[in-house]
Amino acid sequence: FIEHCQLEDAYGYTPSDFPDAQLNQLELDELLAAIKAKNLEAIYPLSPMQQGMLFHSFYAPESGVYVEQMTLKLKGDVNVAAFKAAWQKVVDRYSILRTLFIWENRPTPLQVVLKQVDLPWNNLDWRSFSTAEQQQQLSQLLTSQKQLGFQFNVAPLMECTLIQLSHDT
C-alpha cells in the first residue's frame, strides 16, 4: 500500500483537502473529472466581485470588458528563451495566474488554483511587413484576441505573444 501511494501516478483528493470549497466527495470527483488536472493547490468560492466579473463576461462575451492587453516595445537583442522563462516564473509565483473557474452544473462558481501551468506563448515574425502593415496587423491581432476572450475553465487566463518587427526590435 505504501509503495502504491508513493507512485507518481497515485494521487487522490478528499473534501478535507479543500475545506473552503464545501464539496462532498462526489462533487469533488466530478470537479476533478471536469478539469482533468491532478496538480491542484486550492479550491475556493468566488468573491462577490469575481462572481460579478464572471457574470458580465458571459453576458457580453464579445465585449472583452475584462480583457487587459499590454504591449511593450523591446529594443536590442532579446534572449527569447530567458524572456519566456521570466514570464513563466511570474506565473509560477502568483497563484491567481494559475487559477481557472468552474461554474457549469454548480450552484455557485468555484476558482481552482493549479500548482503548475504552462504559459501559452506565441512567436510571430513580422519583419517582412512594412511599418504600416505591422501597425495594421497589431491592431487586428489585439482586436481579435480581445473579442475571443478566454476559456475561464482553462488556466492560465493569459497568454504572451512576442512579435519580431525588425532585426533589433
What is each PLM-predicted segment?
Residues F1-Y11, K38-P120, F129-T169:
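Acyl-group handoff/entry surfaces in thioester-processing enzymes
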Residues E3-E27:
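AMP-binding/adenylate-forming catalytic domain of the ANL superfamily
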Residues L26-Y44:
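C-terminal, charged and often intrinsically disordered regions of DNA end-processing helicases
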Residues W126:
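Helicase-core coupling region on the C-terminal RecA-like lobe
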